[in-house]
């Protein structure tokens, strides 16, 4: 039973990631969010919350962070229309520093 639950959570996390990526591309009118990429989503076991990891290509992270936090209710309401869940998880946006570190390491290695 535990494996089925974790598989379901992983599947829903991936679905949330895909839907958020689509929402950022199609419905967000703020140009500062055009460089935001969703890298991963980790939903809690009870699906009450989800951590959304993102990176930024164009804008500064400090500019994008409060915008995403304010828009989390909008994203949650849009997700509720596409996800077939009783309760849509609350979204928390977290900057993904690991992907930036990886890009920096690749850049340094390419210089060698």
From Swiss-Prot:
Record's keyword annotation contains Cytoplasm: yes
Keywords, sorted A to Z: Cytoplasm, Ribosome biogenesis
GO cellular component terms attached to this protein's record: cytosol
GO MF term set: ribosomal small subunit binding
GO biological process per UniProt: maturation of SSU-rRNA
Subunit structure: Monomer. Binds 30S ribosomal subunits, but not 50S ribosomal subunits or 70S ribosomes.
Identification of the protein by name: Ribosome-binding factor A
Naturally occurring in which organism (per UniProt): Ruthia magnifica subsp. Calyptogena magnifica
